[in-house]
From Swiss-Prot:
Keywords: Chaperone, Cytoplasm, Protein transport, Translocation, Transport. Belongs to the SecB family. Its main location: cytoplasm. The gene is secB. PANTHER family: PROTEIN-EXPORT PROTEIN SECB, PTHR36918. SUPFAM superfamilies: SecB-like (SSF54611). One of its GO terms (biological process) is protein folding. GO terms for molecular function: unfolded protein binding. It holds the Pfam family SecB. This is Protein-export protein SecB. The keyword Chaperone applies. InterPro entries: SecB, SecB-like_sf. One of its GO terms (cellular component) is cytoplasm. One of the proteins required for the normal export of preproteins out of the cell cytoplasm. It is a molecular chaperone that binds to a subset of precursor proteins, maintaining them in a translocation-competent state. It also specifically binds to its receptor SecA.
Length: 162
């Protein structure tokens, strides 16, 4: 196929995603009841995990994406351990249409960061005297949708007259 002057139209360049850096931005592990918490317990602790994703622009095509993972293990009323990890990455996104930018930053980039963050959590918990905590894979698509629904609901509440 040619355009009016006989030249073939150039295809749009494909989107590019590059990881420029990965790093621990914040890491905290607490074992407040050691050494008693390290003794064998009657039943496994209840472990609650919270995961959040954020992104902000650094330059025209560079973005920082942060993956925050917080967790707490409790046995009855006793806290066995708690942790917080903020793991960051700097990404370059080129030729990404504006409508795809948010999903790339909040789904694809965290998906690339997660295995490294998971290993840091497992090692931190192990180094705290407990068996390594192997986090289950995260469905970042569902997390993205939940956050979008929450934002839409919050905007709906703000937009309503009192």
């Amino acid at each position: 196929m040619t355009n009016g002057n006989g030249a073939t139209p150039e295809a749009a360049p494909p989107p590019q995603l590059n990881v420029l850096a990965q790093y621990i931005k914040d890491l905290s592990f607490e074992n407040p009841n050691a050494p008693q918490s390290l003794a064998p317990q009657g039943q496994p602790p209840q472990i609650n995990i919270q995961i959040n994703v954020g992104a902000n622009a650094l330059a025209e095509t560079e973005y920082e994406v942060t993956l925050t993972i917080e967790g707490k293990a409790e046995s009855g009323s006793q806290v066995m351990f708690s942790f917080e990890l903020v793991y960051g990455g700097v990404f370059r996104l080129v030729n990404v249409p504006q409508e795809h930018l948010s999903p790339m930053l909040l789904i694809e980039c965290p998906r690339l960061l997660f295995p490294f963050a998971r290993e840091i959590v497992a090692n931190s918990v192990r180094d705290g005297g407990f068996p390594p905590l192997m986090l289950d894979p995260v469905d970042f698509v569902s997390l993205y949708r939940q956050n979008m629904e929450r934002q839409a609901a919050a905007q709906g509440v703000q937009g309503r007259p009192s």
